[in-house]
Amino acid sequence: MPVFLSSRFLFFCIIVPLLISITLYQLDTFDPAHHPADSLISSTASIPPLINERFLTGAEFIGVGLLNSPEDIAYHEDSGFIYTGCVDGWVKRVKVAESVNDSLVEDLVNTGGRPLGIAFGIHGEVIVADAYKGLLNISGDGKKTELLTEEADGVRFKLPDAVTVADNGVLYFTDGSYKYNLHQFSFDILEGKPHGRLMSFDPTTKVTRVLLRDLYFANGVSLSPDQTHLVFCETPIRRCSKYYINGGRVELFIQGLPGYPDNIRYDGDGHYWIAMPSGVTTLWKLSMKYPFLRKITAMAAKYGYEPMFMENAGVLQVDLDGNPIAYYHDQALSHITTGVKIGNYLYCGSLWHSHILRLDLLKYPAQNKKL
């Protein structure tokens, strides 16, 4: 190749695109921050002694094609129904049978938004954290939907996420971000700044209180069995913490999770189950460590390209002190957002799948595995 051609090739095919990329990077206003140093600790810090790394081998699928992205799950013991919220706005309930083929899916009500967290009030009503509507109360077998709250301290919710209900009727819930909505949530993760809040709503006084602010994408929340504290998850920094209701003290519950926590559920038998939509991949690890990589990823997302980092999803079982007990996951699994133990089964919701997953914990137990 003549020298002048090779020089032109170098200039137009390498130097010009590089200069354009640098200019776009400098002009883009997205400004990611460094994550706290303790959020970058090894993911092996919370690996338990018992592991099932072939979740999909024994998984059964419930309501295939009828449950579009069932993000959270709540079990109503008296009726035997599982309640969930779907991406099309429907809150549905599922009567589960021994054979998944005999399971019955019913429509309850369409919120007109995106129902995420779901729980039951003390009078049997269905409480929903709707990403676009706020905190909802559904009663009368789906005939009545009431908006309970949509803002706190003058700041409107952008991403109501998870909810749990105390024995005295007080609702505790999270707002993942006051800056980004559900459609934009990846930008909140990539920005690396604490926009999340933990809140309470008292149905008697109608008062919404901010209990904690400046959380890193506040996600799942669960009440302790003695009702003294909450355990809540912060997704990007792979951490769960305790919030003591009397006094407001905060202390670490578990950190260095093997994945990015979403919902957390107490099983009534001394254990919490923490769902993780993705394990700690190399791309995730690098992006969390280096803000400039998150800025590049955010810029790409603005132009319609979002690299998929999600793999090796699963559910971690921990005891009341946050000690890891068992880990159920699969390299080929992604977007698992909740895990609820009902009897001998683990039921899992998802932001991606069109069904609920079920795993028989007796047939497919987690076993000792030397790492």
Swiss-Prot record:
The family assignment reads: Belongs to the strictosidine synthase family.
Q: What does its record list under induction?
A: By salicylic acid (SA), jasmonic acid (MJ), ethylene (ET), wounding in local tissues, and infection with the fungal pathogen A.brassicicola and cucumber mosaic virus (CMV), both in local and systemic tissues.
The alphabetical list of record keywords is: Glycoprotein, Phosphoprotein, Signal, Vacuole
One GO cellular component this record assigns the protein to is:
vacuole
For this entry, list what GO says about its biological process: response to ethylene; response to fungus; response to jasmonic acid; response to salicylic acid; response to virus; response to wounding
Transmembrane parts of this sequence: none
The protein in question is named Protein STRICTOSIDINE SYNTHASE-LIKE 6
Tell me one Pfam family matched here: Str_synth
Q: Which gene encodes it?
A: SSL6
At what positions is Phosphotyrosine found?
Y303
The glycosylation sites annotated in the UniProt record are N101, N137
What domain of life?
Eukaryota
Annotated signal sequence range: 1-21
Its annotated compartments are: Vacuole
Presence of the UniProt keyword Cell inner membrane in the record: no
